[in-house]
Each structure stands twice: as structure tokens, then as C-alpha cells.
Amino acid sequence: PARGQLPALVPVQDPNTQASFVAQRILELRDEGIELEEIAVLYRAHYQAMELQMELTNRGIPFNITSGLRFFEQAHIKDVAAFMKLAVNRKDEVAFKRIARMLPGIGVISASKLWLEWLNSPITKSDDPPISFSEHLEKFKVPSKSKNTWIQFGYTMDELCPDGELAPPREMISSILGGVYDDYMRSKFTNYDNRIQDLEQLKRYSEQFDDSTDFLGQLALLSGVE
């Protein structure tokens, strides 16, 4: 029987180079007459596909994910983005309420009440972030069950905007993972380790950006992060 083409082992320098190679090979196969829907890319773990999904999106190559959601559409990616979006834009109601509902004892109604208190606090009254979020947040009326995590949330926001300045995206992600979100993720998701790998991959990607606003803009282009 006739043999097909043998697999090729292609050494590459990094995940970005690998993604570029795979995307280029897909285009070559398409030009040879193979339909895109007949081409598949296999990978061992979801986080390994981040760069490839970005490359395919940037090149306008349509694709479907059969192993779940696209990388940037996953809940934990959007959760981390919410913290960053709130640091960049303190009047982002969607981001604030998403974060608030992660905290124990806070539901839809409590999140709405806290949002109004946040909106009317000194936190939103200046164009620049406050020197200390935690100083203001400790005065908020929160359910007793939420008090400790609410205070921790304030400390996390302090780290995202040290001395009233936005931290670089890599530092922001590290602070979010080292703060209140890690406890939430451990209690919420059964595949905690896989999601941590995703977020470590996101952190590596963020090293390309010095400005958190630019980083969030790129995420929005790639995935429509709300």
C-alpha cells in the first residue's frame, strides 16, 4: 500500500516561532488544495495552544476548538482580565461586579450595592488611581462572611496600582494570582493546576507589553474580553 508523508520533527526556538510555523504550514496546505476544515492541530494541554490561537487570529485563519473554549474566552482568563480592567478603568461596572461576585457571601444584590458605594467613593473621583485602595475599601459595608477577602481584594488592588501608578501587566498578573483570586480558583475549579498553567502562559505573553492598557487592548482584539 502507498505510504503517506512521514511526520516531521521541526526544532523551533520558542512557542511564538512554533505558532508561526504551524500557521504558515496550514496556509501552504490550503494552497495545495486541502480544505481548512480538513486540517487539525493536536496538542497535549490547552495552555500550549495560546500562541497558535493568537497567530491564527492575527492571520485571519478561521478555526474551531474541539477541546473546549478558546484560550482567551475561558473564565479564569476573563477573571484575571477583570482585575486588570478595574485597575485601568475604575468605573468599569462589569469588571467590578465580576470580581465582587467571586468573594464569599456576595451575590448579585450585594455586588450592586457595593458598586454604588465604590462609584461614590474617592476611588473614582480622580483621573488617577488612589494611593491606597485598601484604605478606602476597609470602610465599605460588606457582609461579615466577606470581610477578610474584601480586605485582601483591597491589598491586591494596591499592588496593581502601587503609589497610584499602574503596574506592568506581568506584575499585575502575579499580584492577582498571589492574592484573593488564588483562593477563589482553588475552591471554584476542579482543574486548578491546568488553569494555573494557562495563567502562567498568559503571564509569559504579557512580558511583551510594558503598558497594561495596551495589553488589555490586545486581549480584547483576540477574544472580545468583556
Give the residues covered by each predicted segment.
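Helicase P-loop NTPase motor core
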Residues: 1-62, 85-89, 120-123
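Glycine-centered flexibility sites
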Residues: 4, 33, 67-68, 105-107
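Conserved beta-strand termini and adjacent loop/short-helix elements that scaffold enzyme active sites
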Residues: 12, 66-68, 218
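Structured loop/turn residues at secondary-structure junctions
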Residues: 14, 44, 68-69, 207
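Short, surface-exposed acidic/glycine-rich loop or hinge patches that mediate macromolecular interfaces
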Residues: 16, 46, 70-71, 105
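Conserved helicase C-terminal RecA-like lobe
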Residues: 35, 49, 53-55, 59-61, ...
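Conserved short loop/turn motifs at secondary-structure junctions
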Residues: 39-44, 69, 100-102
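Conserved RecA-like helicase motor-core motifs
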Residues: 60-70
